[in-house]
Amino acid sequence: MSFYARALTHRARPGYRIIPENTVTEDIELGAIGEETPLLSEGIITAAEETAAVGLPELGVGAVGAVGTHADVLYRNRNAFKSVLTGNYTDLKGNPLKQRNAISEKTKQLGKQIFQGDFNRAFPDNLKLETEQEKTDLLRYYNHNRRLAGLSEAYPQGKGYAYAKSQKVLEAEKRGLTVPGYKYLGPGNSLNRGPPTNEIDADAKEHDEAYSQSKTAQEVSKADNTFVNKALDHVVNAINLKESPSNTVGAIIGATGIGTKQAIEKHTGVIYPSVSGMSREINPKYLNSWSDWIKENKPNNFAGIQLPEDFYTEEQTLSDSPMSESTKRKADTPAEETPSKKGAHNTDSSSQSADPQNPSSSGATTDLDVTMAMSLPGTGSGTSSGGGNTTGQEIYEIPRPFTNFGKKLSTYTKSHKFMIFGLANNVIAETGTTGNLHRLLTTCLAEIPWQKIPLYMNQSEFDLLPPGSRIVECNVKVIFRSNRIAFETSSTATKQATLNQISNLQTAVGLNKLGWGIDRSFTAFQSDQPMIPTASAPPKYASVSGANGYRGMIADYYGADSNNDIAFGNAGNYPHHQVGSFTFLQNYYCMYIQTERGTGGWPCLAEHFQQYDSKTVNNQCLLDVSYKPQMGMIKPPLNYNIIGFPTNKGAISIGENLTAMRSANVSGPEIATQQVSETSNNRIHNFPATFFDIYADIEKSQRLNKGPWGFEHPQIQPSIHIGMQAVPALTTGALLVNSSPLNSWTDSMGYVDVIASCTVMESQPTHFPYATSANTNPGNTVYRNNINVNSLTSAFNGLYGNAATLGSL
């Protein structure tokens, strides 16, 4: 509360309570005091106070605004003004008031000793005084000083307190001295007056909110400077016709008011709004050397004494003080003790020390006593039986040691260029077996091996990853660049070709989950038709030796190690990714059927892929697919260290069924004889050398789970395919005779860019001071089962089995 409000309140006589005007009544009692007290409406105080708070240059404008804004308040409180000016006190209706007895000098001295000039603290209701009248007078003294400090009054627990809370006496909102036409542009208003009228009014609201959260004078100054900068921006924008002029008037008034306020603050040293709620402690160096002087002058709050700048140390913020509040607030709230301060204010006086060095009367302990007692080491004075008088001190919680190992996220991105062929559909039959059981229907859909690590990182990047590393997300973007259709210019009349053939492009996601086929690598083609595959082998990822060998994805993309690759210098053995060159996708999707099973023919694969006219999608991203593995471990998981006796824990009751890693055995695909049986598999923590090989699948949720009795919902990573449909060679009508098969195809190929990116998470925690490797707790340990899942076979109901890989066909 400002000087003007304090003076007005003081002249109104001791005992007046200022509450919001919308609850003015003569029925509110002071609880235990029980005296009906006439009330002075806050509206009139607000009108006078906030007119002066704007600053001298704006005093005239503020006075006019105050009169206009609070005209009705001034009229309703005319008798209150008359009381203040004449000294003949009446209530709001003009009736004479019953005069109170003045507070005795004894009560004032008692209050000085108890509160030590600090009225931010709560009123100690449990003080045991000689008479009830002393407590009544002490409360009047306490509330009188709180009003002078601009703080809300304390209501004792009684009828008056309950009534005040039920009527929300201390929660009413005030308008403040706002500029006409605005809701927040001006001092003293509340923070919930509805939506701002325009942009400068919104800036003023943000400024008020910053005030309400300010804990230091620096934060108040920062809030002022921020508002002034925004106001000047509005003025400049209006001059440049970038903003409505409606903000300009308010911006000029607001900036002028803040500037005037800061000038007055610099001259007087008084900060508005008040940040006096900051609890201050006397610097320990003065406590030791000036102890007698401090004890003598602290009851008067060092009035009239020029103190050193470092006399106080401000350590407690406004939010930590139970009575702290900002000048701009929604409403005054009753003084309430925080849990950490209950020991300071609620201690029974009978338990206080009767030491002659304790200057407190009636057994009340003060902050000075605590400070002085703690500043006399070795004397034993002022201490309790526990070795130190901790009454009134906050609880000190000793920080616990903790190491946050954190998680490191690394992103690996590669850009590959691949060539695909417009392969023709052809049925490949098994040879050398009676009955020709296996049948493959070839397609042009080339597999993009995004389930394999080499697509994202080279050998060194993989080797340098620590144990426990796992892929948390991978993403692939497939961009179709263009296609090429070739033909022989010297062809005979039966194999003519033109330049305007139609070529279609196909894309598919998740064909592996259908269970209708598998990926294969082609090892032979028809001699006179290079677009027709005639033989196949298992898909190629790692290096394959022999006539149909493959260098492997690592050597193909990134090159081989010159120290151990005998073919390092051979022609064509260069790192395609490293030089931005094209290489080939090795595997293509094939549908599969066993002829002795009544499967019902070839299913409609076209329902599950998308087709495009290749001429319309050049340089277009046709696939952008992301996947988050359920269990993407790519390095051996962290282990736990067993300590205690016995190391072999024996049987442990877990109170429920163990969620063992079960496997389903499916036999007899025919509907009539199909059976699904369950097998429970024990958890194992050892891993074969190839389990976390660079060519292992990223998704391992069918084989791994977390914790000794944890459970995972297994899944497989969906496949990605892109293909260029075979382009037929144009011929004469000979093919229409006797329904001759179409087996003449033009050489065609397509070019695609694949941008592959994966995010790897790693963490290296340790809980033992001499552990030589990272470790974790048993609940985070990863276990495996002994089922060898084979992703080179077709899936069943969305998961892979452990059947053998189909050999060469």
UniProtKB/Swiss-Prot annotation:
The reply on keyword Protein biosynthesis is no
Q: Where is the composition biased (Polar residues)?
A: 315-325, 346-365
Keyword match Cytoplasm:
no
Q: Write down the SUPFAM superfamilies for this protein, in alphabetical order.
A: ssDNA viruses (SSF88645)
Q: Name one GO cellular component term.
A: T=1 icosahedral viral capsid
Q: Which UniProt keywords apply?
A: Capsid protein, Clathrin-mediated endocytosis of virus by host, Host-virus interaction, T=1 icosahedral capsid protein, Viral attachment to host cell, Viral penetration into host cytoplasm, Viral penetration via permeabilization of host membrane, Virion, Virus endocytosis by host, Virus entry into host cell
Region Disordered: start and end of each range? 315-366, 373-392
Which intervals carry biased composition (Gly residues)? Answer: 379-390
Show the InterPro entries listed in the entry. Answer: Capsid/spike_ssDNA_virus, Capsid_VP4_densovirus, Phospholipase_A2-like
Q: Name one GO molecular function term.
A: structural molecule activity
Indicate the principal place this protein occupies in or around the cell.
Answer: virion
- Which subcellular locations apply to this protein? Virion
GO terms of biological process kind:
clathrin-dependent endocytosis of virus by host cell; symbiont entry into host cell via permeabilization of host membrane; virion attachment to host cell
The source's domain of life comes to Viruses
The text the record gives for the protein's domains is: The N-terminus of VP1 is sequestered within the mature capsid. It contains a phospholipase A2-like region and putative nuclear localization signals.
Functionally, this protein is described as follows: Capsid protein self-assembles to form an icosahedral capsid with a T=1 symmetry, about 22 nm in diameter, and consisting of 60 copies of size variants of the capsid proteins, which differ in the N-terminushe capsid encapsulates the genomic ssDNA. Capsid proteins are responsible for the attachment to host cell receptors. This attachment induces virion internalization predominantly through clathrin-dependent endocytosis.
What name does the UniProt record give this protein? Capsid protein VP1
